[in-house]
Amino acid sequence: MPRIRCITEMGMGVDVHGRDATKAAKRAVSDAIRHSSLGFVRLFGKTPQDMFVDVTIGVPNPEGVDTSAVAKELPYGTVTVKAVKGGLEIPAESGGDAILIANAAVIVSLDEGK
């Protein structure tokens, strides 16, 4: 069935020490959903479990993201997570530890049918 996109949230997460792409991605998802309350779902006769939640994470090293761990940040719905090249890595002045920044797009959709 076709889906209706209901909301798009964006977030940013940072790992200041360690270049941990998963940690930064989880923080980005948390940032994206932190101020959202999706009470409208019930207006469509649906429950939060009926939602489809599609997450795209942008990081410099997408292969370093544990997508299963990131998916656990979402409390409801059928969740899919993909990691793509993006984000930002800020090198340390000393050439050592860098700051890793992840961006997240969280898209919530509902099935058009009943």
Residue ranges and their predicted role:
Residues 53-57:
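Extended hydrophobic secondary-structure segments that form protein cores and membrane-embedded regions
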Residues 47-51:
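Short, charge-patterned binding micro-sites
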Residues 2-45, 58-65, 105-113:
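Conserved mixed alpha/beta catalytic, RNA-binding, or beta-rich assembly cores of soluble enzyme
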Residues 58-85:
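Short, hydrophobic/π-rich interface segment
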